[in-house]
Swiss-Prot record:
Full protein name: Genome polyprotein 2
Keywords: Hydrolase, Protease, Thiol protease
UniProt site positions, description: Cleavage: G229, A230
Gene that this polypeptide is encoded by: RNA2
Matches recorded under PROSITE patterns: HC_PRO_CPD
EC category: hydrolase
Catalytic reaction annotation: Hydrolyzes a Gly-|-Gly bond at its own C-terminus, commonly in the sequence -Tyr-Xaa-Val-Gly-|-Gly, in the processing of the potyviral polyprotein
One BP annotation, GO: proteolysis
A Pfam family hit: TMV_coat
Segments for region (Disordered): 502-539
Compositionally biased region (Gly residues): 515-524
Active site per database record: C117 (for helper component proteinase activity), H189 (for helper component proteinase activity)
């Protein structure tokens, strides 16, 4: 029997990534600390046992002809049954008991890296997969190593095999390699062509169905938690990451307090400099994280660790320490304190996300996500990791504001005596399995021999007459500057002309142009009369305060009708945002966004692009919420950030912003209340659950009369109410055949609700009723056998009934597998949304900010090739809206 070519290609990809390299040691079984815990012995030592077991010299002959290292391609081309491999089993030591003849049914396998030996279980199954399932099985094989990682527990491996047997029924009777067990290290190993390690035991399982029966019998047993490969550690750890063991980590808040207190000191004395240098050298801990030592717990948002050994903070700290040690010797005593403060400023800036592009701050989630490592004893941390990452972002933003306040704080002229760094000692999380000596010595205080420094009170030297004179001169100069700015800049307008340099400045007051005196207004260089003054046609600079009320645009091509239309649209948008009118936003968003993009082309300084992004995002989020009943925290955080930027640009919101309205509707969603109550009822037993379901149906019917339900609320109400009534009908029905049909229908409704609401609810009443009906049918079949039927007929009836029960069980397993696939897909989509939404929001804000900094289309009048606004001829082949249009922007250089 040949392996399907598609499956063979998938195995080649897996073997290329996870098999032992040619230079690797193939004779040792290692644990998580790379210490040998088992050896593969020579085949000669087991010849006597082999002869006693098989008494078949032909097997020995075939064994001796097989090379030591089989070619992987030849193994994958042929059926494993052509290689009757014999493992090194011990006749006196078996795990669970097994006959040795069954263990001879084996096959040639690849040699996988330590921790991935469970992949050997899938190699013999590959030969029994039908062509219709080849594509699905290939994807299953390729995804499994990344899904389980290295060293999963035995229960996880058995769950995977149960899932595979459900999806691919043809593999139930397929053979599997021997699974060895070491009673000393308490770990399993799926053997390959090297055999069983010496003195290891073997599991009583030679085929898939025997392995699944072991999974059913071992529920709750301790050995189900033993690792397949080694003890808990970080999977995918690289040698290049070993530097983290010696890196120095310190709590973020402790380092911030240390530097903040350092800014309040005078460093004219040697003892003060030594105290700060000693505090910096002793700050933090080493040996915080390693392959077998997990990063400290990150559930508390305030516990954030700073890696002092990574750039850029390590470079700034080195400069500060070097200056405290020797650099200050060439400076005057009066300048030393100022220079030390400047170095401390630079270190603080590296800790703030506002001043530094990269951050050295970590919590557990950021460390594991950034370095792509997985703690193999814990899985399914996706939602928890997302929450920890969001908490880290909020923490860094909050501390950045605090650092900014520290940097702007004026230093006190009073010198504090006997200063000691205020660094609270805090040890990282110590796990039970970690030795106590793994934690380094905590931060130490300043040396006790520091001599007190005298308190110096500086006398006041202020001159009030000089300050008054400076204030008067400043006011006069400010008035003159404002007058010149208005007279020489705001009154000038750009005018086009038909000759080089294509534009000219036409100065003068707009009111004088309309007065009618003095022999007429000025003429343009082209000899044409000046354009009559209309509101908003002159070029003006926008300020943050007047953007919301001033509709002037930086363009000379807009006529009065276009400007009036833009002004009317802009006022409608402001009114809809202020009143939080989602009806207007959903109805007019497409037209409003198009108008805002056109306005952004005319005025590069106004926040029209940012406003268009906000309207588009709000519309999509609100529509998605009404259809699915879900919106992520990351999406809401992005909208809150956009609203803050719009407020800074002069866009006013009402008491409740659109984002707050969506958040409140999500929190008060009727579907969420029904879902919570439905999950609570699913845990009840007996008649109480039936009564509770009926009460829930009545509550839903009452609340369905509300007119503010979303589409998702209506769908959830219909599904849950139908299931509640179906359960009531089942409890009132006495006909077994009718009950079975109703149970099937109710089970389908239950699976549908789990798919819609993202739950994993199983009503005990349905499962109990189903088991009761199946038991009655078996008993009835037995009763029929006692009515004079022949033994052959009785056996046929029993086989038919058993086959039907097995078919129903398989169908139920298929539905459960489909439900798990849907839940996994939903969870992956949620993870992608949590990770990508804040990144996209920040990228959009950055693009809009870069667009405004580039000047928008202020250089448009100097470039005749740029497209014109509506009402004028547009350049062929150029889109209407283009970001980064400014000629001086760095993206255009």
């Amino acid at each position: 029997m040949m392996m399907n070519s598609m499956i063979r290609q998938g195995w080649q990809q897996v073997l290329r990534r996870f098999s032992i390299p040619t230079s690797g040691d193939r004779l040792i079984v290692s644990n998580s600390t790379d210490q040998p815990i088992g050896l593969f012995g020579a085949f000669d030592t087991s010849l006597q046992t082999l002869s006693q077991v098989t008494n078949d010299p032909e097997v020995l002959k075939q064994k001796s002809n097989i090379p030591t290292h089989l070619d992987v391609a030849s193994v994958l081309e042929a059926s494993p049954r052509s290689f009757p491999w014999v493992f090194l089993t011990n006749s006196f030591c078996t795990f669970g008991g097994s006959i040795h003849a069954q263990n001879l049914q084996a096959f040639a396998t690849a040699e996988f890296k330590s921790g991935f030996c469970y992949m050997n279980l899938l190699i013999p199954l590959s030969f029994d997969i039908i062509d219709a399932h080849a594509d699905s099985f290939r994807g299953f094989v390729e995804q499994l190593p990344d899904t389980l990682g290295a060293y999963p527990s035995l229960s996880m491996v058995l769950n995977v095999m149960l899932h595979a047997a459900t999806r691919f029924p043809e593999i139930v009777a397929s053979p599997i390699p021997t699974i060895a067990f070491d009673a000393e290290s308490l770990q399993f190993h799926v053997t390959d062509k090297r055999g069983v390690p010496g003195m290891w035991n073997i599991l009583k399982a030679c085929r898939v169905y025997e392995l699944l029966s072991l999974a059913a019998d071992g529920i709750g047993c301790e050995y189900m938690l033993y690792p397949v490969g080694a003890a808990p550690q970080y999977s995918f750890w690289k040698k290049s990451m070993d530097h983290f063991t010696s890196d120095r980590f310190v709590e973020f808040l402790a380092m911030q307090d240390l530097l903040a207190s350092a800014l309040e000191q005078d460093y004219a004395t040697h003892d003060a400099r030594d105290a700060l240098l000693s505090a910096l050298q002793n700050a933090g801990y080493t040996n915080v994280v390693a392959r077998e030592r997990r990063f400290p717990n990150g559930h508390d948002p305030s516990i954030v660790w700073l890696n002092l050994s990574e750039a850029p903070i390590s470079e700034k700290l080195t400069e500060l320490k070097r200056y405290l040690l020797v650099g200050h010797r060439s400076d005057d005593t009066a300048d030393i304190t100022h220079n030390v403060h400047q170095h401390v400023f630079e270190v603080l800036k590296t800790m703030s996300v506002q001043f530094s592009k990269t951050t050295n701050a970590y919590n557990r989630a950021r460390f594991e996500v950034n370095h792509k490592v997985i703690w193999n004893a814990e899985y399914g941390r996706g939602p928890q990791q997302n929450a920890e990452l969001e908490a880290l972002v909020l923490f860094l933003n909050r501390q950045s504001l605090e650092i900014e306040n520290i940097l702007h704080r004026t230093t006190s002229p009073v010198v504090v005596t006997s200063w000691k760094p205020d660094v609270p000692p805090a040890a990282p999380e110590i796990k039970e399995e970690e030795p106590t000596h793994a934690i380094a010595t905590p931060i130490t205080e300043a040396p006790s021999h520091v001599t007190p420094v005298e308190v110096v009170n500086l006398p006041p030297t202020r001159s009030y007459w000089a300050e008054t004179l400076v204030g008067i001169l400043t006011a006069i100069l400010g008035t003159v500057f404002a007058f010149l700015t208005r007279a020489l800049i705001r009154a000038k307008r750009l005018r086009r002309k038909s000759t080089f340099p294509w534009v000219t400045l036409n100065s003068g007051d707009d009111d004088d142009d309309q007065s009618g005196g003095g022999g007429g207004g000025p003429q343009t260089p082209g000899g044409q009369p000046p354009v009559p003054h209309t509101r908003g046609t002159h070029q003006s600079r926008f300020s943050v305060q007047d953007i919301a009320s001033d509709t002037s645009l930086l363009s000379v091509d807009l006529d009065e009708d276009t400007l009036s239309q833009y002004d009317e649209t802009f006022q409608k948008i402001r009114r809809a945002l202020f009143e939080t009118s989602f009806a207007d936003i959903l109805q007019n968003s497409a037209r409003w966004i198009s108008t805002l993009e056109a306005m952004a082309l005319a005025d590069g300084n106004a926040p029209y692009t940012l406003l268009a992004q906000y309207l588009n995002g709000i519309e999509e989020a609100y529509t998605n919420f009404r259809n699915t009943g879900h919106i992520s925290r990351a999406t809401l955080s992005g909208f809150f950030a956009l609203e803050d930027n719009l407020r800074a640009a002069g866009i006013a919101f009402g008491t409740t912003t659109p984002t707050q309205t969506i958040q409140n509707q999500f929190a008060d969603s009727p579907a969420r209340r029904w879902k919570t109550r439905f999950e609570q009822i699913a845990c009840e037993l007996g008649d109480a659950s039936i009564k509770s379901l009926a009460d829930l149906a009545d509550i839903i019917d009452t609340e369905r009369e509300r007119g503010d339900l979303t589409q998702f609320d209506v769908l959830a109400a219909s599904s849950i109410s139908s299931l509640c009534r179906a359960v009531r009908i089942i409890s009132d029905t006495t006909d077994p055949n009718a009950q079975l049909a109703l149970v099937e229908n109710a089970t389908a409704m239950q699976n549908n609700i789990n798919a819609i609401l993202g739950t994993n609810v199983s009503i005990p009443f349905l499962s109990a009723t189903r088991r009761l009906l199946i038991t009655r049918r078996v008993q009835e079949a037995g009763a029929e056998s006692r009515s004079g039927a022949t033994p052959e007929t009785v056996q046929q009836l029993a086989d038919a009934e058993l086959a039907k029960i097995v078919s129903e069980a398989n169908m139920y397993n298929e539905m459960a597998a489909s439900q798990r696939d849907i839940a996994n897909a939903t969870r992956e989509a949620t993870i992608r949304e949590h990770v990508l939404s804040p990144v996209n929001a920040l990228a959009n804000v950055g693009m809009a900010a870069a667009f405004f900094r580039s000047g928008g289309l202020r250089s448009r009048a100097f470039n005749p090739a740029m497209p014109t606004m509506p009402g004028g001829p547009a350049a062929a082949g150029r889109p209407m809206f283009q970001a980064f249009r400014g000629r001086g922007h760095r993206l255009n250089r």
